[in-house]
């Protein structure tokens, strides 16, 4: 066998120095904002059960659930608008999508609460 060659430690080159301050400012990363429903879920929890808390894992699961339902309703409403050759999703498409996606009694309650919310919003904007 041939003798092993001796390895010398690799010499490091000195780091290049920055000459201008503008390169520091342009390379500064901004933290991307992630929008969640956490604050709204927490407010509803405190309205219904004031002395109850919620873990981060549970909050994450509920946030995923709300995002999923939102996606389903939005896509169904989009399809309904396309079927009727409309480019705008109105309250009617949302209401029909909710009736199609949510089962039975849950759909009835969701529609009544949604109607109530839209009525409340409409009256507050006109006044």
Curated annotation (Swiss-Prot):
Statement: the UniProt record of this protein carries the keyword Acetylation: yes
CDD domains in the cross-refs: HFD_H2B (cd22910)
Transmembrane regions listed in the UniProt entry: none
Position(s), cross-link Glycyl lysine isopeptide (Lys-Gly) (interchain with G-Cter in ubiquitin): 120
Keywords: Acetylation, Chromosome, DNA-binding, Isopeptide bond, Nucleosome core, Nucleus, Phosphoprotein, Ubl conjugation
Covalent cross-link Glycyl lysine isopeptide (Lys-Gly) (interchain with G-Cter in SUMO), where: 7-8
Low complexity: compositionally biased ranges: 11-24
Annotated positions of the N6-acetyllysine modification: 7-8, 12
Record Pfam families: Histone
Residue span of region Disordered: 1-35
Keyword hit for Oxidoreductase: no
GO function term, MF aspect, one: structural constituent of chromatin
InterPro entries (alphabetical): Histone-fold (IPR009072), Histone_H2A/H2B/H3 (IPR007125), Histone_H2B (IPR000558), HISTONE_H2B_site (IPR055333)
Localization per record: Nucleus; Chromosome
Modified residues (Phosphoserine): 11
GO cellular component: nucleosome; nucleus
Functional note: Core component of nucleosome. Nucleosomes wrap and compact DNA into chromatin, limiting DNA accessibility to the cellular machineries which require DNA as a template. Histones thereby play a central role in transcription regulation, DNA repair, DNA replication and chromosomal stability. DNA accessibility is regulated via a complex set of post-translational modifications of histones, also called histone code, and nucleosome remodeling.
Record text on subunit structure and interactions: The nucleosome is a histone octamer containing two molecules each of H2A, H2B, H3 and H4 assembled in one H3-H4 heterotetramer and two H2A-H2B heterodimers. The octamer wraps approximately 147 bp of DNA.
Protein name: Histone H2B.2
Origin organism lineage: Eukaryota, Fungi, Dikarya, Ascomycota, Saccharomycotina
